[in-house]
Every structure is written in C-alpha cells, then in structure tokens.
Amino acid sequence: MEEDNIVDSKEIENNVEDKKEETPSSSPSPSSSLQQQQEEGGVVKQAVSNLVSSSITLHDDAKLIQVTGKDEPFHFISVPMSVEFLNLEDVFIMQSDAYIFVWCSEQANIKKKAKAVQMAQKLKVEIGCQRAVQVLEIGEEHPTFLFCLGVPKGTKLNVTKEKNDIFQVDEDDEEQVLEPEFFLFKIFTGTDGKPSIKPMEEDEGINQEMLESSACFILDCEHEMYIWLGKGVKKSTKDTLIPVAKKIWTQYDRPEYYGKLKLQPIITWVFDGAESCLFKSKFSKWVEKAQPLQTSYLSLSSKKKEALNFDVSSMHQDKEVPVINIGAASDYSNGKLLVWCSGGGSGNKWNKVEEDDFGIFYSNKSYVCHFIYKPENKNSIRSVIFFWEGLYSNQRNYIGYKFGLYKEIQKKMEGLKSDDPVEYRISQNKEPQEFINLFGTELLVLNEELALKPMIFQVRANRGTQLFPDPDSCNAKLLNSLDSFVFLFPNKYIIVWHGKVSTEHQRELAADLFTFLPPEYEAGVKEFDQGKESDNFWKIIGGNSNDIVINTFINENKEEKEKEEEEKEEEEEEEEEEEEEEEEEKDNNKTTTIIKHLRPKKIKLFLCTDNSGIFKADQINPFSQVDLNSQECVLLDVYHKVFLWKGSKSTDQKLNDTQDLAKQYIETANDQRPSDCSVELVEQYNESPLFKSYFHSWKVTPPKVFIDPIISYKQKLAERLQKEKEDLEKLKQQQEQEQEQQQKENNKIVEEVKEEVKEEDVKEEVKEEEVKEEEVKEEEVKEVAKEETKEEIKEEVNDEATEVKEVNQVEEEVKEEEVKEEVKVEVKEEEVKGEAKEEEVKEEEVKEEEVKEEVKEVKEEVKEEVKQDKEEEVNEEIKEETKEEETKEDDNKEDEKVNEENETVNEENEVGIIVSPPSEKVDEANSSSTISSPENEGSVSVKDKRKSNEPITPSVVSSSGDLLFAYEPYHGPPIHSSNSPKQGRKGGRKSHGKNQPQHKKNHSVDQSPLSSPIIPNKSLNLDIDNQSFDLNSINNNNSVEVLDGASSPLSFSSSSINSNSTHNTPSKKNKNKNKKKHNRSSSLTHA
C-alpha cells in the first residue's frame, strides 16, 4: 500500500508536502515463474497474487484456490498461480475481480465440484464480480484462465499430475497422507506490556465460540495464516501481530514447495463481523450473527391497513437535498486538496493523483478526496473526506481505505492538532454540489484508460460521462432530447450534438469537453442541434432522426389570437403592412396551435418498501441506477408519465401495492400535469430506451438466465467448427497468394541475376587487362632496382677509407629501397587482391618470392667480398700489433700488478660471455656495428682502437669477422628475459632510419637474453684460433670503469673466458613437469 503523508501545520495555507511510505504486501506472482513474495509489511493483502495485465482485461489480485480432500469437509487452500500445482483429482477456483473460473477434470468427485461452485458463488458476491461463475473442463479453458497461469498463447493446457502432492506424508507410513490441521493462537498484551501467545486447544477442533471481540487471534492453517482482529483490540496489540505471525510460521514444518520456491507466508487480515468465506470454511460450523429485526411487531393484516393510511400527499412535497457545510470560504482558495485513487482490487494500494488530473475520474476505481482548510474567522484546522465510488469499482476498496489510508490521514490530522476528518461516502452520478466545487464547475468520468479510438460522452448538468455502449448499438439510439452528446474521433473531428431542451451550461461543457483530454485528442469541433443534422452527421453516427429518444413532453394549448390595430405615425410603411395582416386575421377568424417541447419540471424517484412495517414510498434525491433494488418496486415520475419499475426478485404483493400507490399519486397531483398521464410498467432487464434515458450513463447489466450446458456445448462446438472452416479457407487463400508472390519474386530474381552476370563478365575483362599492365610495370621496376643495387654495391666496395661505414649505408639504402618496393608491391597487391581472382594472387606471390631470393643472393655475394677484404686487413693488423707488444713489455708488467690487485675485487663477480646466435636476415646490418663504452658514445671501430693502443672490448662476432663480446653481471642462475630476440630485432630495425644519426651501439647486448643458451658460431671459432689478444689488458682497463660507472651494463671479472660455455636453462618440458608435480602435491595436501 502506498500511503501519502500529509502536511506540516506551518504550510497549510500555502502548499502541503506529501511524503510516501511503502508497505509491501506478501503475495506471490500469478505467472509461471513464481516470483518471490515480499517479506516486510504492516498490512498484508488479502489476495495471493499481484496485478495481472492481460490483452483481454485486467485481473486484480488473481489467485488460485485448490479444493482438495477425500471426504467432506473439503479444504480450500490458496496455492501459487502455476500449472505445476494443477492435478486431475482436485477442483480449482481462479478468482479475480473480472472473472471467476472453476476448473476440474472428469476424475474429480461430484461433491467436490458442487462445493467448489458453491464457494465460487460466495466469492463472487464477496468481491463484487460482475460476471457469472464459469465452469471449465480440460480442453475448454478460457483464454484468460490460461493467461493467468502463464500458458503461452496458442498452446493447450497439459496436466499430467493425477493426485495432490501438497500435503505432508506420514513419517511412519509413507503411503498415508496427512491432511492439514488448524491451530488457533490468542494474542494479548501481558502485564509487562509485551505480547503473549496462548494456544487454544480443544478435542473437537476449533470453533467460532473461541473468538473473542476483545482479543486478536492467529489461525495457522499450515499452508496459510489468518489474523482475526476483534472490535475492542488495542492499537498496541495490532502493531505486533505481523512479527508474531511470522515467528509462528518459522517454528513449525511447512509444505515442501514453500522451501523449493522460497515463498513467503500468506497472511490475510480478517475483521470481526466482516469475515471472508474462506476464513469461515476453516471452522467446522460457522453461525451468522443474528441481524436486527427489520419488520414491525404488527401483523400482515395491520400492514395493509397502515399502508392505506399512508399519506400520499407527502410524495408531492420536494425532498430537500442535505447540504454539506464545509465551513470554508466560498472559493475554496484557502485550503489544500489531496486526492488518491485505488490501485488494486483489494483497496490496500492507493496512488496519489496529480493536480493536473483533478476532476477526472474512472468509473472502475474509487477515489479519496481529502480537503484541508481553515474555517472563516478561526485559527483551527479542519478537514473533510469524500469517498467517491465508480459504477464499476470494487466494494472492498472502502474496507481497505478504512483500515489503511484513513488511519494514516487520522494520524497526520492529530499531529496538526485537528479533529478527525468528517467523511462523506458518495457514488457516481450522485455527487453533491459541494464535492463538485472542489474541482471547479465540471467533472469528467471515464470508463477505461485513454486510447486513440472513438469515444462517446454524455453531458448532463455539470458532469460529462463516457458511455460504455454495446458495439452493435452505437448509433442514434443513444441520443435523447434532455442531454448533449460528444462524439470524439482523435486527430479527425469532434461532433457535438445538443438535444432540444438541453441547457446552456450543458452546451458549453460539451463544446469544451475535449480540453480535459491530452492535446492529441484535439480536432475541429462541429456542433449540431436536434432537428438540424446534416446527411454527413447520420453517415458518421448511424441511424436517423426517428431513433432519437424524445424524453420531453409536448404542451398543446389552442388559443384564438386577436391582435389590436395600432397606428404608428413615425413609420408609415410598417403600419400599412401590419394593418393588412390584422384585417386578414379578423376576416378569417384563424385559430393557431402552438406545439412546444418542454423539459420535465421535476423528475422524482420513489423507492417503495415495507421494511419499516408500513408500505410507503421514500423519495431518493439525487437518484441513479444504483438505487434500483431488485427486491423492491420503484416509481419514476417524469411529470407527463409515471414508470413503475419491478425488480426481478420483487413479489406480486409489492407490485399490486405499488400500482395502487401510483394511481393515488396521479389523482392527488395538483401540478397541472397532462390529463393523459398514465402508469407504465417496466420490468428489470427489459427496460425501454425512454426509461433508461432519464438515468445518467445507464450501465448495461445482462440478466441472469440459466443456460443448459449441453446446449451451450453444442453451440460452442458448432461455432468452433465454423471457425475452423473459415480458417482453412483463409489459409488456402493465403497459400495461393503466397505462391503467386513467390513466382513473381523468383522471376524478378532470375532477371536480376542475368543482368549481374553480364556486368561481372565485363568487369572481369577490364580487371584482366589492368592486371596485365600492372605485371609489366612491376617487372620493369624490379629490373631497374636490381641494376641500381649492383652498381651502388660495386662503387661502395672500391672505397677503402670508408669501407665499414659505406657498407652500412649501402645496406641501409638497399633496405629502404626494398621497403619502399615492398610497400609499393603490397599496395598494388592489395588493389589486385580486391579485384583479381584467387589464382592470379597466387602467381603474384610466387613471383615476389623469386625477386626476394635474387636480392638475397646479391646481398650474400657483397657480404662475402667484404668479409674476405676484412680478413686480410685484420691479419696484417695483428702482425703489426705483435711487434708493438714486444716493445711495450715494460708497460704490461705494470698492468699485471694492477690486475693482481683487481683479482681480489672481481672474485665475487663472474662474467658470462654471450655469443649471439647466427643472426637472421633482418639483423645483419645491426650485427656489424660495434659496442660503445659507457664513457665514449661515439662510434669507434676496432681498427682505430688497436692503433691507439687502447684495450679492445670484444662483444660478439659480426659478419665481417670482428669479435664483439657482451658482458653482463652474473646474478646466479640464468633467468629468462621478458623480451624475445625477435622483439629486439624489430626495435633495432626501426632505430636505423635513412635520415637518423648512425650511433654504433652494441644491439646484441639488449637482443640476447641471459637465459638463452649460447650457441657457438663457426666463424667465431675460426677467428679465435687465428687471433691473439691479452685478456689482462682488457680486465685492467675495463674493470675499474665498471666499478666507477654503476650505471654501465658491462662488468668484468678475472675468471677465464670460455667461448663454448653455456647456461643450462630449464626447458618447457621440465617446467610442465614441475607444474604437474606441484598440482598433485597441492591436491594431496588439500586432501
């Protein structure tokens, strides 16, 4: 239930702040998914399920009741709304505000079926359902019944469960089923102020006498619970009932499906004197409380005598309408109006209405209008509540309001130091003027939610009401001479029709009625008066002028009119014309008859009853269709005629007495009514259109007639067969149409394919020519490239001074040109690939590979020539160095001393020689560069170092034969680096652009990870055998530099250098083995 807090006392004069509090109810969803119920809540809904919206209608609080048990008394248990709970043994009742179904199979017991129908009839009266109870069998389910159960549209209901399985099984004997037992607990407040529980036990079970009006009781039915509130229960006790009920629910065993579906307990409120029929069925015997005697102590004979003594003349006196004195200002500007509308069938949910929607009501809902005001010349705060009920609203809304929203309003008014609000309960079409003044001057009543479809409104007095006519009878028969009618066609036109005796206020309201609706309903307005309709009007509305209900009376007065002659001096011409007309009238002695339609002076309704022991007629003012009691007779006086309406359950004696009373009423009338005034008999369900026209927005209620089920079954079967035939014919027609359409489409597709094939052939020929031209151009470009590379290489080899630099530059230029060629080839390949076929692409790839192999061969020839030249130069340089070393023996001795001192320092550091593996094609240019020391970042060749008598730092063996050593600090076992050799090569390739400076750094240091195994190169072994160098000089010069420069990546030690030494790193297989052993050991430890 949504409850709206009202106001603070400081803001009454200006605005009222509303605060909403939510109190969820415990109710499972009716769909097959069985949503979880809400747990918390101070007020629990009486129904088991939430709102179910259907394309057919709205079903509020739909719930499923299972009628089960072997023998009488049968059990009525509320179960979740799902197909899973249906079985062939029991009978099920589906209850909603719109429908009540009784579903059963052929296996169900006859007594059980009868009890289920009897309970369904009681539920229908209790909830105010308008439709009759429908008994369904397997295979004949109503679409709404299937929808509420969650059965998909178009599928049939399939129930295979034969027996009931919601009852618990006896632990000792599993074949024996335990039927549910009922336990009654008395809840009262103890001396300590805390709630106390007292079980009510009797050998014969629970009975009605256990319930006391001064206490509260909780009835535990194993599958559901009821809270019974006595009339004299204190407020403090009520607040503790829900927690106590939940505690009792958790202490005892419940059916298994509650645990599987995680459902919350079904708790229902029951009030003393207003017990539901399901609650009464839990008791072995329930006796209705005796109603007060409504008959007098007089005998029937005395009734007749006193009936004759009834003063009929009192019926001619007008009954005053009771005036509601609100006490506020006449303009209602100093107050605050709050409006709520019912949001559910049980009346526990109330939704706030926005101010823009004030004055618009729905006939299927109830409204609570709370007006807070300050009386004139007073400082106190007062309030009044109008409870408005629509014609199609649920009567239980008022009960839910009294025990829910009214309590909240009462609390807020107490906080404002105000008395309880004065309450008025009014029904549709019987609104007092004070109620209408709260919303202005007019009201609008709708029967259904707004939709862009034609609507008809009847305007009478200051109310506009949407009609709910039969679709087949929507024509001029709805019109009458007393009222105005509005035919609204959204986005097209609005037709307003006025009766002959409709008032000016009605005409204004009818013309402006569309202003109450959203802007999309606006259209051009065309007004018509009765008797002045056009042909287009009858085409749109239907019918003709003879179908209009003439509910006026005609006053015919024959008078001889003699006009006196009057001479006018100022206007001679007018005087002559008037004299001629007067002379003609005198000569002919003409008599004129004036016929005029008049509105009935007063329309009165009298209810004729003998409840007080005296047969009399009580006037009802204002009156509506609701006042027509089927057990009584009613007199309707329309001045020129008196209707006698007989209820379907009224007796013949009441009819005779009412007829006598009607005759006396006409005879004693002194209001100059027509002399031919008579009494017309009207029976319930057979009312004439003239009788209905005097009631505002007549509600169509079909009579309750017994229908033979066999006849109805035959009619349904015939209708079903007829529908099947029609469906088959429609299917055949559709199939024929589809086949024709498919043939047309196929012909179109064939023509389109032919055109596409022709276009593709032309495109392929063009593509082939373009491909051939591109191939010729590529061959020419490749030949030119080959010649240029050969010439450039020969020129670079001849230069002796800059051999190494020029070779590098040539290789870089060759690479750049290759890259450019590759880019061009790739661009052309992409264009050719997108256009040419797969076979042509393969041929181009083969040709590209041949070109690359030729370029590789040229490179290898150039490299071999360069290697041979360098080897000769190195041999000559080595010879010269041996001579220089002999002259410098003295210097070497000093160096040896320094080495001995450094050996002690370098014992802890070990140097690993990393010999790079045979470099790939991409690394050939990088391997030829030498490593620069940390101090000297410029590019210095090996030859220059030897000439300058500086120690040489070998890193690795390049392709030219130089030794290039990479020294890395030794930190224990080798560890795999995160960078792979391929990544280093890609980075080194990018660093040598054409326009970038050539810094000769040793890329092999970064490229070769320490953890990778060292593979000795054949060229390295040959060069080491042919060369000789002093390791001590290397250690003496470089070890100090490494110690000084902490940031240098090179470190040295006195350990011997072994070119063939390798680091054994764990292989992938060993890693996998280790991981598997770890997993097993871990699993064992866990086990």
Swiss-Prot record:
One of its GO terms (cellular component) is cytoplasmic vesicle. Residues 983-1002, 1066-1080 have a biased composition (Basic residues). The keyword Cytoplasm does not apply. Keywords: Coiled coil, Cytoplasmic vesicle, Repeat. CDD domains: gelsolin_S2_like (cd11289), gelsolin_S3_like (cd11292), gelsolin_S5_like (cd11288), gelsolin_S6_like (cd11291). The keyword Repeat applies. Disruption phenotype: Severe defect in the ability of slugs to orient properly towards the light. One of its GO terms (biological process) is slug development involved in sorocarp development. SMART domains: GEL. One of its GO terms (molecular function) is filamin binding. This is Gelsolin-related protein of 125 kDa. The lineage of its organism: Eukaryota, Amoebozoa, Evosea, Eumycetozoa, Dictyostelia.
